[in-house]
Structure formats: C-alpha cells, structure tokens
Amino acid sequence: MKKRSSGILMHITSLPGDFGIGTFGKSAYEFVDFLEETDQTYWQILPLTTTSYGDSPYQSFSAVAGNLNLIDFELLSESGLLEKGDYEGVNFGDNKEKVDYELLFNARRPILEKAVENTKQNSSILEEIEKFEQENTSWLPDYAEYMAIKESFGYQSLNHWDEDIKRGEQQARERYRAELKDSIRYYTVTQYFFFKQWLELKKYANEKGIKIIGDMPIYVSGDSVEMWTMPELFKIDESNEPLYVAGCPADDFSPTGQLWGNPIYDWKKHKEQNYSWWVYRVQESFKIYDVLRIDHFKGFSDFWQIDRDAEDAVNGTWEEGPGIELFEKIKEQLGDLPIIAENLGFIDAKAEKLLDDSGYPGMKILQFAFPDHDSLDLPHNYTANSVAYTGTHDNDVVNGWYEKLSEDEQKLVAEYLNQRDDETITQAMIRGIHSSVSDYSIVTMQDLLDKDASSRMNVPSTVGGNWEWRMLAEDLTEEKKEFLKDLTNRYAREREENDEI
C-alpha cells in the first residue's frame, strides 16, 4: 500500500518578496523549510512555462521554456551578474498581495538585459551557458528565435507575422537570425538563468524530502513555438491556421461553454509518429518535476472540438482522443511515472475507463461534494488511489465558496464535517480531506491561511484579475504551522524518506 502523505498547492508567483512577484529566491527556500518543518511531502505548483497575454500559466509561448518572471535578482547578484543598485529602488508595484504583470513586464526587462550583458565578462558562466545550449538543442534555439521574432513584430501573435517567416521558410529564418542576434542571445541566456535557479531550488527541496508536483496543460497555445515549428501536429489549413480550437461544452456553470482557443491536435499524425512529441514533452517535464499532474485528462478519451470562427463553445462536437494507447507508449518509452490525472468536469464512462486503465490517481475536490448527498467527492466515497483537495487554482477559496451557499447548505456542510466550535469552516474542510482514505491530500495555501475570496487565483473563462494573488510573509503564523503539522501527523500523513506517489 502506498504511503499516506500531504502537501500544499501554491504557485511560485504567490510567494512573498520584494520583486513584485514570487521568485526562486529566499522566500522559495523558506517555503521549502516550512514544508519540511510541518512534515509535508509535496509542493504542488502550476506550470512553470513562460506566460503570454492574460498571464495564465496554461497559455504559453512554449511547452518547455521557463517563465522569466520567476528569475530572482538577488541570486543573479550573488553570481556577480548584477549589482544591488541595479534592482533596489525599482518600482515593482506597491501592493504586496497582488502581482502587477504589466508593470513587471517593463520593470524587469532592463535588469535582465544587464545580467545577460554581464555574462560576457565571466568565463565560467559563459562555459555553463554553452553547456546549457548544447544540452537543450531540441527546443532552445527555436524558442529564442521565436521570441526574438515576436518581439520584432511588436509582440504580435504568430498569425500576424509576415507570411514567409510565419510559415518558417528557411531563407526568412536565416535573415531574422542575422538581424536579431542580440535578442536571440537574450532569450537564450535568460533560459539558462531560469533553469539554473529552478533546478537548484528543486535540489534543495528534494534534499529536504520535499517532492515537486508540476503541471502540464493538455494543449499548447496557437501563438507558440510548437505551432510555428511543428504545425503538422495540429489540424490546420493551407496557411497553417488552426481549423478548430479547444474548449468545453455548456453546463450548469457555463451556459455558453468554455472557449479556450487552443489549436486541436491531429491525433492521427501523432499516432503515425508513435506519439514521439508527447513522449518528449513528458520526458522534459520530469527533468524539472518529481510528479506530474496532467490537465484535462478527459481530453485524451474524447475532446470538444469547436470551429475556429465560433464566438462561444456551444456548437462543438465530441471527437475521439488517443486513449490508453498514448499512455502505453509513454510507459513503454519512459517506464512507470508518478502522474496525477486531472479528471474534473464532465466525466463519462469512457473517461472513467481511461483513468482506471492508466492506473493514475484522479482528483477529488471537497467543494464539489455539496449539497449532493451521493457525490463521489464526499470523503466517505473516496478511494485510496486518489488525491484529495479542498479546492484548486480554478476554485474559489473555501471561505468564498462557503459564503455563497444558502444557510441550509452551510448547515449541511458543517454537520457532515462535524465542525467543532474551535474550528473555522476552512479548518474543518482541511480535516475532511486529511482524514479521508485518499493516499494524498493537498491543501491550497489560501485555505491553510484561512483567506477570503479576494485571494482566489483564477476564475475560469474570465480575462483580467487572475493569477495575481500573493501571500504575505506574516500570514504564515506559528499557529497555522502547528495546525497543519498536528493534522498531518494525526492522520498519518507525515513525511518519510522514499515516499512514493
């Protein structure tokens, strides 16, 4: 039987600090120390890939390249690439609890440019950069070139580029490489900064017994290096434009469905190539994570396909995905891997069978359990091979969710959880998942801190105001630490060496 364990869900961007956004610096190391101190096993984060307009980590210019916002300036200073005066006194935003992405976009760039320029004076770092480039030829040159060209077009999306370079014609690419050498080097070296800092942080966490649960979106963005260099992997027209886009059909929560806009995969082409790109993508993910959550798992059994010109997601069609064949190929190439399947939303018998056949643990969200007396998300219906959550980045925090319930529904929740007089409703919910039979129990940081609805990370199908929440260092009191450690040990979820998911 697998070892019971627990962890915290909080993205890097939500860490406290002085740079307007959470980074790989001191606060990240202190967060690892907190996880160790409270006997946790997992730190779950959102995708680390570079973000685009809307700031969502699920819409990236690359399926591999890292988010430059997470690079820590103090660590660059310790490496001799920056002076403290290069970043101290810079305005990164006045609100310590919210990220101002537009401000950061303009404030961080000149500082990173200075660090990139200073690498030219450090021979040992230049050797490390050269080694990094040699080890990442499968994605790094294309990414750096793509971003440099995008910048030269005023950051316009791929479909607004000149036709020759949009189609990746060799002569055009050679011309842009010659013209944009400095910009290409910037995007190359900053990836070196990103991966050096992240892998050092991950090593520190692993040495403390903390494993990183990463996140892989099912789809890539239509404005991405993959769409540019591998258009044949998607359903496209003769101009390399997507014929269809992804989303979810209408339901009780979204009467017009969810129109995500990502290009749809040509699964027939992937199969012809033995799913080599997927094997590669998963392999790259496990270079930076210990465990991998795969988003929208249902999309591998059936996916909702919407015409590219549609204004909403109502009139799509269900199309067949690759099914278990894809995951058998991944297992054949990479062995058994610790993967979590995000099986939320509309799940039919076919999707359930795919989850069962894969053997991956699915997710249970306690907020989804009420007020349905028969819900499979009620803890007494959990199975051991599952991951229990109070909520995720797409849910309201417990306090915000609870406030929206009717008085009768609130009473039902309190009675089911047998809420004690000395407990908040959030603490009762955390106890509910920790005491369940699920092998793994994950609490959002907002819920551990008993935050209100203003700390919600994301409202799906909305633009603006998302992905901004940050904790304050003083939020994490000794009382909160003691509560988490006590609950973790009471329900036999304390960390042990060689824990496996």
Model-derived segments and their meaning:
Residues 46, 211-213, 217, 291, ...:
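Outer-envelope exported proteins of Gram-negative bacteria
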